[in-house]
């Protein structure tokens, strides 16, 4: 056992480091979602792996007829649906069918780009790390922050940021059109 106050790795490296198909898939995901390195992708895979493992254990518990299985399954499904990873009313089989893109779509970096607050996925990352983005009134500077479904509509430019002004040249043309300003 280790010291509980010490930070530990939140990801596992691939067992076969030079597998060509996996490497090509990773590069494509990194380009699509604007990740800086494969470690960020491996962290998302670890999150997915954890929930799929829990889903398998809960399915086995239900098959054995354990009483707590239904309560624990409802809690896990509720948590994943709060983050927008699962749809409302999903079941345990839906957890097993999750893909890595379901996790990556919930990152703040992806949400900022999809909502049109940035012109590119890389610009979205820059806006976040420079403190130009807020979620529910709080400045967030972590691109990998997983956005809850309820907070999705509260993503906006930070009030103290120069980007909050309508005429700022770096503002996305989509957001200017959405707010009624002139582009």
UniProtKB/Swiss-Prot annotation:
CDD domains: S4. Residues 106-168 form the S4 RNA-binding domain. One of its GO terms (biological process) is translation. It holds the Pfam family S4. Keywords: Ribonucleoprotein, Ribosomal protein, RNA-binding, rRNA-binding. Belongs to the universal ribosomal protein uS4 family. PANTHER family: 30S 40S RIBOSOMAL PROTEIN, 40S RIBOSOMAL PROTEIN S9. One of the primary rRNA binding proteins, it binds directly to 16S rRNA where it nucleates assembly of the body of the 30S subunit. This is Small ribosomal subunit protein uS4. It comes from Methanothrix thermoacetophila (strain DSM 6194 / JCM 14653 / NBRC 101360 / PT). The lineage of its organism: Archaea, Methanobacteriati, Methanobacteriota, Stenosarchaea group, Methanomicrobia. The gene is rps4.
């Amino acid at each position: 056992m280790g010291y509980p106050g010490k930070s530990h790795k939140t990801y596992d490296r691939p067992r076969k480091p030079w597998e060509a198909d996996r490497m090509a898939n990773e590069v494509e995901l990194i380009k699509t979602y604007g990740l800086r390195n494969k470690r960020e992708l491996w962290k998302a895979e670890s999150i997915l792996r954890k929930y799929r493992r829990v889903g398998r254990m809960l399915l086995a518990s239900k098959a054995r007829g354990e009483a707590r299985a239904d309560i624990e399954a409802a809690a896990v499904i509720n948590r994943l649906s709060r983050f927008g990873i699962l749809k409302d009313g999903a079941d345990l089989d839906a957890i097993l069918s999750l893909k890595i893109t379901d996790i990556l779509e919930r990152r703040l970096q992806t949400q900022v780009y999809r909502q049109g607050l940035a012109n590119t996925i890389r610009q979205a990352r820059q806006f976040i790390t420079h403190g130009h983005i807020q979620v529910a009134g709080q400045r967030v500077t972590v691109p990998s922050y997983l956005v809850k479904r309820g907070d999705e509509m509260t993503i906006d430019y930070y009030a103290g940021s120069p980007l909050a002004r309508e005429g700022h040249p770096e503002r996305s043309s989509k957001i200017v059109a959405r707010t009624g300003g002139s582009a």
